[in-house]
Amino acid sequence: MGHSAVLLCVALAILPACVTGAPVQRQHKLLLVSFDGFRWNYDQDVDTPNLDSMAQEGVKAQYMTPAFVTMTSPCHFTLVTGKYIENHGVVHNMFYNTTSTVRLPYHATLGIQRWWDNGSIPIWITAQRQGLKTGSFFYPGGNVTYQGEAVTMSRKEGVLHNYKNETEWRGNVDTVMKWFLEEDVSLVTLYFGEPDSTGHKYGPESQERKDMVKQVDRTVGYLRDSIKRHHLSDSLNLIITSDHGMTTVNKKASDLVEFHKFSNFTFQDIQFELLDYGPIGMLIPKEGMLEKVYSVLKDAHPRLHVYKKEDFPKNFHYANNPRITPLLMYSDLGYVIHGRVNVQFNNGEHGFNNQDMDMKTIFRAVGPSFKAGLEVEPFESVHVYELMCQLLGIVPEPNDGNPGILRPMLRSGSASLLSSQHHLVALLVGILTCLAKVL
């Protein structure tokens, strides 16, 4: 047997023990809470004493920039994979198949394994492979399997789930506390569908949205009281964040982006369409019709930006994925795309350019690993995954985040930095990569 083959056998023998063996010493658990659609400044026109005290006792970001496209499932998956959307593949809230033209709504898509399990490994599975137990409560992507592995503890919301029930919210918090205490879970992701639902229905500037933010704040207070009541304050780090913001929909008739009214455009030229979902649109023209459809649409409306897939702005980190169609488009802030008929009537919407301030969201963190009274500069949500891996002391999967971006918010010595065991894992992976090229 040659030297390369011997090294390969040794590396393959050692690597599983390093990855799946006893983890480095960890003292702290982690709870990631997402309040869907919580715009970065929602706490500025409402009294939020619990979020305020959390900032005083922990870390607050001026705001957090979500990934593009600013939709619920794609942005939530970025948080737990550390990847831009074009790299993790959950490119839309809706499952779609361009061959069969099947399109499934948001709730149905939550249970479609192949939509989520497409090559990226979320933090639940990474942590479990390194000896930890994890949980997901209503968090998008948390109730399917990845490479055959399921999250240790999981709950999935029903199709007709009432997002607004504050009593249920407290019950969900109680369940999560039991997971930490009775099931020895180290990581839980907890999802609430508000204030997104209220923002959609009534608009982000409405009194109803303001009232819902007060409910969110009361729930934050209940959560922090529960942590203290269960004596977890010294062993549990808490992160509260969101997926995206919200903006008011422009409903002025003369400004509507309506495909069925565009001159020289016909759906007879289209093989597949994904429209009528906020400001994002995807089209597959019929064979030989790409240039014609593109030329008709590219200047069809001053608020609509239409691109060939290969020309879509690279800074969005969105179009370079097999699931993205040959024609891709988005509209300006406040303008939604109507297809064959007008079926969108929300007063609030998201999905827009992630550089628009209305799409920015919140980040708060408190616990034994975080500094107190620190406000940090804005950052991208893609970096949160690396932070969570540091807090849990686990080796991250390959990702697009930078582990140094958020490290300054941690107390000195509190981050579970890579141990010698983790360096050995990296070394062995490097050996395997090199050997694969010569064998």
From Swiss-Prot:
Outline the segment boundaries, as ranges, of region: Required for enzyme activity.
69-75
**Could you tell me what reaction this enzyme catalyses?**
a sphingomyelin + H2O = phosphocholine + an N-acylsphing-4-enine + H(+); a 1-O-alkyl-2-acetyl-sn-glycero-3-phosphocholine + H2O = a 1-O-alkyl-2-acetyl-sn-glycerol + phosphocholine + H(+); 1-O-octadecyl-2-acetyl-sn-glycero-3-phosphocholine + H2O = 1-O-octadecyl-2-acetyl-sn-glycerol + phosphocholine + H(+); 1-hexadecanoyl-sn-glycero-3-phosphocholine + H2O = 1-hexadecanoyl-sn-glycerol + phosphocholine + H(+)
What is the deletion mutant like?
A: Mutant mice are born at the expected Mendelian rate, are viable and fertile, are grown normally without obvious abnormalities. Mice shown signs of hypertrophy of the intestinal epithelium, as the widths of the villi and crypts, as well as the thickness of muscle layer under the crypts appear increased. However, no spontaneous tumorigenesis either in the small intestine or in the colon is identifiedknockout mice up to the age of 10 months.
Report residues binding Zn(2+) 1.
Answer: D36, T72, D243, H244
Q: Which Pfam families match?
A: Phosphodiest
GO MF annotation list: metal ion binding; phosphoric diester hydrolase activity; sphingomyelin phosphodiesterase activity
Q: Which residues lie on this side of the membrane: Extracellular?
A: 22-414
EC category: hydrolase
- Tissue expression, per UniProt? Expressed in liver and small intestine.
User: Which residues catalyse the reaction?
Assistant: T72 (nucleophile)
Biological process according to GO: fatty acid homeostasis; lipid digestion; positive regulation of ceramide biosynthetic process; positive regulation of intestinal cholesterol absorption; positive regulation of sphingomyelin catabolic process; regulation of intestinal lipid absorption; sphingomyelin catabolic process
Membrane topology recorded in Swiss-Prot or TrEMBL:
Single-pass type I membrane protein
* Compartments where found: Cell membrane
- Stored InterPro entries: Alkaline_phosphatase_core_sf (IPR017850), Phosphodiest/P_Trfase (IPR002591)
Give the signal peptide range: 1-21
The protein's UniProt keywords, in alphabetical order, are: Cell membrane, Glycoprotein, Hydrolase, Lipid metabolism, Membrane, Metal-binding, Signal, Transmembrane, Transmembrane helix, Zinc
Question: What cofactor(s) does the depicted protein rely on?
Answer: Zn(2+)
Q: What does the entry list as the binding residues for substrate? A: N93
Q: Where are the transmembrane segments?
A: 415-435
Residues that bind Zn(2+) 2: D196, H200, H350
* Residues modified by glycosylation: N97, N118, N143, N165, N264
The residues on the Cytoplasmic side of the membrane are 436-439
Its PTM note reads: N-glycosylated; required for activity and transport to the plasma membrane.
Q: What does this protein do?
A: Choline-specific phosphodiesterase that hydrolyzes sphingomyelin releasing the ceramide and phosphocholine and therefore is involved in sphingomyelin digestion, ceramide formation, and fatty acid (FA) absorption in the gastrointestinal tract. Also has phospholipase C activity and can also cleave phosphocholine from palmitoyl lyso-phosphatidylcholine and platelet-activating factor (PAF) leading to its inactivation. Does not have nucleotide pyrophosphatase activity.
Q: What is this protein called?
A: Ectonucleotide pyrophosphatase/phosphodiesterase family member 7
* Taxonomic source organism: Mus musculus
Source taxonomy lineage? Eukaryota, Metazoa, Chordata, Craniata, Vertebrata
